[in-house]
Each structure stands twice: as structure tokens, then as C-alpha cells.
From Swiss-Prot:
Domain ABC transporter: residue ranges: 6-228
Keywords, ordered alphabetically: ATP-binding, Cell inner membrane, Cell membrane, Membrane, Nucleotide-binding, Translocase, Transport
Top-level division of the source organism's lineage: Bacteria
Lineage, highest ranks first: Bacteria, Pseudomonadati, Pseudomonadota, Gammaproteobacteria, Enterobacterales
Pfam families xrefs: ABC_tran
Record protein name field: Lipoprotein-releasing system ATP-binding protein LolD
Compartments in which it is found: Cell inner membrane
Positions that bind ATP: G42, K43, S44, G45, S46, G47, K48, T49
GO annotation terms (biological process): lipoprotein localization to membrane
Length: 228
């Protein structure tokens, strides 16, 4: 049985600006096993976010292949890729990206509604997820009424609501203090343990870096195993 959830083969990404070509990533080979938690570190501007966008199918590589559970991204139409992202991938960002005009229950249930679940079923599943995260008393509140740590916990709940195989997180604790960083990482490890969810986390946060079991560093357009 193939234990690899996502794999990159000779991945390259560059951008053209007139006659000049900017190389962002060069000959990247990378793989993540199912159930692994991996961190991506590197200086600002090193290509971490671009790499995450490629892994999520939000951008196309200049050349090279990405396979998810053995399936080539390049074999999917844009419509199939959108459906794939909603079911198989979850996303957590530095800024929570919650919809400010919707309450917490509505925010978390949104990916389920997009998957054509009924409003009743979506809200029931979302409520149970928020209860798991000790947020059931916040379901009618709006993002502006929550603390930063609470908003990010809601963002994690939304990312996991479809029980994706892989969650991609870009600086998920960048705006949090150490206590809330620990809360978020504890949620990540709980989801990983309970559901075998894989995580790829780009971060500068030293508290988080110390906790992530496997680290990779992007430097000089390439990716390396990193020993902290």
C-alpha cells in the first residue's frame, strides 16, 4: 500500500517580468507520508507560500509534477480541482480569513454547504466540531466578537470540517501569543492522532518550530531536510 499522501517531482516555479525570469523554486522533490506533520521554514520571500500554493493546486508549476494519493494534479480539470480542494484539503492562514458578516456556526458550516450538504446537516456537523474545540458557546457570535486565539480555533475547525486528508497551514500562529500557539498546536496533534490527518505548516514561529517533528527548509530556491 502506498503510504505517500503528496509528492512533488522536479518541481519548478518561475515568473516572467518582461525579458527577465524570476526563479522561485528549482527542481524541488518532496514527499509527505500519510499522518505526518511537517514544517516548512525559510526566510521571508524564500518561496514558502508559493510552495504551499503549488501543493494546494492554487498555482500551477512552471514544470514538474505533483501527485496526491498517486493522482496527478495536471490530470484534473479546474472544476475537478476545486471539488478536490474542498474535500481533500483544508487551509489555515495567519489571518483567520473568516467571513465577517457570518456568525461562527455559519463560517464553519460553509465548506459543507459548498459540498451540497443541507443547511440543517451542515450546521449540526459544524456545531459538533465547534463543541470539540470548546467553542459551542460562541456559535452565534461574529468574528469581531472573538479574541484572536478564538478566531484561529474557529479557522482550524473550518479547515477540518470536511475531514480532509491534508491540512496546509501558512503561518497559523503568526499573530498569536505563546499560550494560544500551544492551544493551536495541541488541536493539530489531536486531529492528527484521532483522524491520521497530515499537516504541512509553513512558519517562522520558534515556539511552533520546536514542536513540529519533521522540518524542511527552503533556501536558494530549493528544499532541504532541516535538523533544528
Amino acid at each position: 500500500m502506498n503510504n505517500i499522501i503528496i509528492k512533488c517531482i522536479n518541481l519548478n516555479k518561475s515568473y516572467k517580468d518582461g525579458d527577465f525570469t524570476y526563479t522561485i523554486l528549482k527542481n524541488i522533490s518532496f514527499q509527505l507520508n500519510k499522518g505526518d506533520i511537517a514544517g516548512i521554514i525559510g526566510k521571508s520571500g524564500s518561496g514558502k507560500t508559493t510552495f504551499l500554493h503549488l501543493l494546494a493546486g492554487l498555482e500551477n508549476p512552471t514544470s514538474g509534477d505533483i501527485l496526491f494519493n498517486g493522482r496527478l494534479f495536471s490530470s484534473m480539470s479546474s472544476n475537478k480541482m476545486s471539488k478536490f480542494r474542498n474535500i481533500e484539503l483544508g487551509f489555515i492562514y495567519q489571518f483567520h480569513h473568516l467571513m465577517l458578516d457570518f456568525n461562527i456556526l455559519e463560517n464553519v458550516s460553509m465548506p459543507l454547504l459548498i459540498s451540497n450538504k443541507s443547511k440543517k446537516d451542515s450546521e449540526e456537523i459544524a456545531y459538533n466540531m465547534l463543541k470539540k474545540f470548546n467553542l459551542e458557546d460562541k456559535i452565534k457570535k461574529y468574528p469581531s466578537e472573538l479574541s484572536g486565539g478564538e478566531r484561529q480555533r474557529v479557522a482550524v475547525a473550518r479547515a477540518f470540517i470536511n475531514k480532509p486528508s491534508l491540512i496546509i497551514a501558512d503561518e497559523p500562529t503568526g499573530n498569536l501569543d505563546e499560550d494560544n500557539t500551544n492551544i493551536i498546536f495541541n488541536l493539530i496533534t489531536e486531529l492528527n492522532s484521532d483522524y491520521n490527518t497530515s499537516f504541512i505548516i509553513a512558519t517562522h514561529d520558534p515556539t511552533l518550530i520546536k514542536k513540529i517533528p519533521v522540518l524542511f527548509k527552503i533556501e536558494n530556491n530549493q528544499i532541504f531536510n532541516y535538523e533544528s
